[in-house]
Amino acid sequence: TKYQRFDDGVEHLPTGWPYDMAKSCFSKHSCHMGVVKALKALAEIPEEKRSNAVNDTIEKGIAYMLIHHIHKRSHDLNRLSKPGWIRFGFPLMYQTDALEVLGILTKLGCTDKRMQEAVDLVISKQDDLGRWKLESTFNGRFHTNIEQKGKPSKWITLNALKVLKNYYN
């Protein structure tokens, strides 16, 4: 929890390791994907085993994602953080999308109204049979392909249903 940043843009960047490396992740604005992946890892720690530092980091990560309404730019909520964040994929590897972020936040018990637009996005992508399509894929980069892009996805459907259940219950 020591190095993950949750700022929304700073004038004076931190220096030293690891900030002097990977400038794309440690530039003036915290890396959205880095925040999401840190939250994803910390959410797996059972609540009773989380240290105060872990809980503080989780709270900062949640707050960071909420000021961005999950998939928007905090300084202009009419713009997406990244266009790919509204195309649902599995597995995501280092990438992320609004569905993954919602899954992490709802797993952590968060159901803030600033999540609603992203939840509505999930609902809007459900087909008439209650399924969701695979819209983004790393197929061709693995030893085997995971489902077929553009077709209904068991994994996206499972994740979407879990998000909706956790958000509305």
Regions found by a protein language model. Give the residues of each.
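An alpha-helical repeat/solenoid feature that recognizes helix-turn-helix modules
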Residues: 2-117, 133-169
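A structural feature that tracks compact, well-ordered secondary-structure segments
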Residues: 121-125
